[in-house]
Amino acid sequence: MGSRAKRRSDQLFETLETISTRAHDQNTDDILAVRGQDVQVVPDSTHLPRMKKFRFQLLHQWLIHNFSPCRVADIGGGKGLLSHLLIESGWQATVIDPIPQELPTKYKDIVLGRRVKIDLKARVPNIPAEFDTRHANYFDLLIGMHAHGCNVKIIDAAVEYGCGFVIFPCCVIDEPFYPPLGVHWLESLADYAVRLGIVLKPFRLNFKGQNIGLYAPLKSQQE
């Protein structure tokens, strides 16, 4: 990442942190727990070389170190690698995507540093449909990794059903509103969530591209 792009990313992250602290009592530190397990703020790894891929593996590692196993909706999950990794870690995960796809045949285990073959018979639960807020009634945590057209719906569903969420907003495609001129899409979404009473935090993963995420714990853990 060039120095100018890094400055912009750092400024955006600081803005998101400022927005997040507006929630409730201007302090979110004391509610960072999910199912009794403390949620650790991810260390800033921007000084390290960024990975060109492995974003699902990186998110998987972040999730299992920051949340206890729960029922996950992998929204726009495509081939289902993230869901597969979570299931292997003892979670219940379901892909919600209108276009069913087969799992990849192999992936890189970034912890062990080796390629892992996936059984050709392996499958992940799949709901072949566009995400609807009503789907959230059956899940504890909603995940959207660059899930086009679903970010606002994920936030709305979290409010209605008390789910936690983890999103990596990217393009403003098929969303019900657009950010005002000069306002970043992540800022707009963070502000929207906070205005609805959601306590959220920004975090970063070490991959190239839009690597800033927003997460919120389960509503039951905020009370």
Give, region by region, the residue ranges found by the protein language model.
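S-adenosyl-L-methionine
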Residues: 2-73, 81-84, 88-89, 101-139
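Conserved glycine-rich SAM-binding loop
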Residues: 78
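Conserved SAM-binding motif I beta-strand of class I
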Residues: 92-98
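A short SAM/SAH-binding and catalytic strip from SAM-dependent methyltransferases
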Residues: 137-153
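A short glycine-rich, Lys/Arg-flanked "PGG" loop and its adjoining helix->strand segment in the class I
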Residues: 154-164
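Conserved beta-strand signature within the Rossmann-like core of class I S-adenosyl-L-methionine
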Residues: 162-176
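Active-site capping/gating segments
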Residues: 178-223
